[in-house]
Amino acid sequence: MNAELSAETREHLEALERGFAERAACDIGDGGPDRGAHVDFDVVLAGGGLSLVYAAYLARRGLRVAVFDRRKIGCGHREWNISRGELRPLIDSELFTEAEVDALVQLEYDHGICRWHGGGTYPVRQVLDCVVDAERLLDGLRARAEAAGATLIDHHALAGYRVGAGGVEVRLSPAKTLSPAKTLSPAKALSARVLVDGMGAASPHAAFDLVCPTVGGVLTNLLDVDPRVGEILVTTEDVEDDRQHIWEGFPGPDGRFTTYLFYYTEPAQLPPRPLHALYERFFATRPRYKRGEATLVKPTYGFIPAYSRLRPMPAARDRVLLVGDAAGRHSPLTFCGFGSMIRSFLPVADALRARLDEDRLDARSLAKVWREPPGLAVMGGLTLMMVPGRRRSTDPRDVNKLLDAAFASLGELGDDVYGAFVRDQIGFSDFIRFMRATAKRRPSIYDEVFSVLSPSEIARWSWKLGGLALKKWSSG
């Protein structure tokens, strides 16, 4: 692995693993600005990745915005795919023109597939079929935020904050580095009316009970690549070390291929140095997925958190709003965080502006900024069934068999249902059709639900499924 990854990449892997392990150590409490006290900003945004879209939009609407990140703001370490129609909010927000959004799309596939070891291959159209130029998107968001007057603070991490009746005081510390040659800038303190947490898995507030360690990169010189096909989910082996490893891969321009290896687990079950360990497996097993003497052009990695919604939410705080992966606003089954963020940022940002105008920034009011689609919890129940450690079966083929039955059913139901499932948007009627079709292929599915989920999780899952049904009936 050392020959494959640069010193800078290894340093950032260490920082990510340390930040994830220490996420709960943030110093949080009361004693912030009193009512009527001057504050520096309307919004302080923690995290300068894709959540930068909030900074650009809110600053353009006249709000005083500051952003900080432990790395350089706008420096991403993921590649993204999305369907073309889901990019529309970038245009509707007036952050980008149609021509600029078109320029962000590097490649468009004919279709995508999901393929399971020992099972079948199931194609779907208009799902994750556009390759987005992540660097160009983030550079554009940073430039737009700066042009609108946002204050950007690179290489600083959240040390803690204090909430008061008049605002929140946010304390920043220089980001830790393994390179002694790098000069650390001084600690900083900011005050704002609201703190927006877009820190993903490193967030001290992150609402997740599942986590998905993910490693990979942009590679060249691979064989077995069809530039017309995106590989959404693929397995090449059964459960090993109590984990079902899954690949995804997307052809890019100029013969490049972006691929990830990941698995689903509960945070307490993570091994030591999980990203390093997974990279070792990535390099060792990648030829089973794609042959060729590949060259790693750009490493991509991280922790993707997910919240099943079948366990109680962590307690919310006044004047703190979670966005993106930190809020778990995507299906824990498909982990389409990029699409979820782009779909949701505009209504969430407008709702936040309204709360600021009304000075309603208590936890209850901020919780209503985003209304959770009932279908997310339904997906959460299925995700828990994919965590091998929760299953009674010791058959290493079991998870692949479950996935094959599920996706064979989606393929049978057609692109609309299949696509809605992957995009977190499946409705009640289609979900029931999906479960019935899956049960025909795998009659044990209902027994598995009751064996994997606890009584309280089953109760919450049933309640959320009822909410999905109510949404259908109330809409006619």
Regions found by a protein language model. Give the residues of each.
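N-terminal FAD cofactor-binding segment of flavoenzymes
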Residues: C75-I113
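FAD/FMN-dependent oxidoreductases across multiple families
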Residues: V131, P267-G380
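Predominantly flavin-linked oxidoreductase catalytic cores and closely associated redox partners
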Residues: A148-P287, F345
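Short, well-ordered coil/turn residues at beta-beta hairpins
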Residues: G47, V196-M199, V323
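Short beta-strand to alpha-helix junction loop
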Residues: Y122-A143, T214-G217, A268-P274
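C-terminal helical "tail/cap" subdomain of flavin- and related membrane-associated enzymes
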Residues: R10, E14-A21, D350-G476
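Glycine-rich FAD pyrophosphate-binding loop
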Residues: G48, Y57-E79
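Extreme N-terminal leader/targeting segments of oxidoreductases
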Residues: M1-D42
